[in-house]
From Swiss-Prot:
GO terms for biological process: tRNA wobble position uridine thiolation. Its main location: cytoplasm. It comes from the Bacteria. This is tRNA-specific 2-thiouridylase MnmA. ATP binds at G35, L36, S37, G38, G39, V40, D41, S42, L61, G147. Pfam families: tRNA_Me_trans (PF03054), tRNA_Me_trans_C (PF20258), tRNA_Me_trans_M (PF20259). The lineage of its organism: Bacteria, Bacillati, Cyanobacteriota, Cyanophyceae, Synechococcales. One of its GO terms (molecular function) is ATP binding. It catalyses: S-sulfanyl-L-cysteinyl-[protein] + uridine(34) in tRNA + AH2 + ATP = 2-thiouridine(34) in tRNA + L-cysteinyl-[protein] + A + AMP + diphosphate + H(+).
Amino acid sequence: MSSATSSTDRLPTAAGDAALQRLRTWPGEHRVAVGLSGGVDSSLTAALLVEAGWEVEGLTLWLMSGKGACCAEGLVDAAGICEQLGIPHHVVDTRDTFQREIVQRLVDGYREGITPLPCSQCNRSVKFGPMLDWAAEERGLPRIATGHYARIRHGGEQGRHQLLRGLDSRKDQSYFLYDLPQEVLGRIVFPLGELTKADTRGEAARHGLRTAEKPESQDLCLADHHGSMRAFLDAYLPPRQGEIVLSDGTVVGEHDGIEHFTIGQRKGLGVAWREPLHVIRLDPAMNQVVVAPRAEAGQRSCVVGAINWVSIAPLQQPLELEVQVRYRSEPVAAQLTPIPHTPEDEARQRPHRCRLQFLDDQFSITPGQAAVFYRGETVLGGGLIQRDDQAQTNRE
């Protein structure tokens, strides 16, 4: 008998029991590869699937050399969980892919004056798709499961797989999953989607998992790996001094790299001024950080490109919805309108774009971050915020 069986003599919590019932009645084959990072969320995901009677194998992606959740430390903890649960553990070396698709693109983005969102790109190009391919081709497993706090509803509009927020609003990760294509969403299981973090800790303790009290990572994995985001950027981008200026060109300070600033930032500017200033633009061509008082920093619209439509078909006419423009930001009301394709757009095969029109001024509309569209708890789609010279701001 595996330790997973012997460690579950205690009855599950109400939330844990509901999760087990959902897994036991899940349609289709109950055979799955679990993406294991070595943290408590993925550990409990594997434990619940084992307890629910699924055929489970652990799969860990080796993303980086060194220490941290995506490095050797995570591999050791993931292997220990698989041993405890009595399931096979596989490690796939994806360091080259991660360096090329995530690290280099992240560095390039910061160099160009945008603030990239590597987690969503990593989910699409490094994690979910490759994990599904590996599980099917190498182990004959039709599904993967992860410890994300999100939900999937099958059979939505036009038979689409719909992505929903996790029930724990403080841990909901749907914002980072908006870019997953339909063929991937149809083969994913999120056992923790209706649990809170407290539920997860409690269930992990019930199973006696070694990761039950493991602290959460508090930052981007690359920042954890290097000690801080600044240290990561300094390792790839040499200091390049430039000016901090007002929107009229008045020089108010100096900086050592635009990559260390983001739109909406107020603290840490190193500028003494008669009123608080906010970053409103990063200009890589001039190597300038442009700042302004809050009264001049509001923005009413932005352009969104590289859109992935999740729960609805591609938009053909304006739509009222809610949009979230940063992971920790609150959703706000907006209208989304398709931008007509020009002959030049067609000739260059540019992807379709949409314009977001906000009802109220927004102060952290950041090129490179995702704008994720919601209707209630359902993710309609999302895309990347682009630079937009036509954005309507209070400065005009």
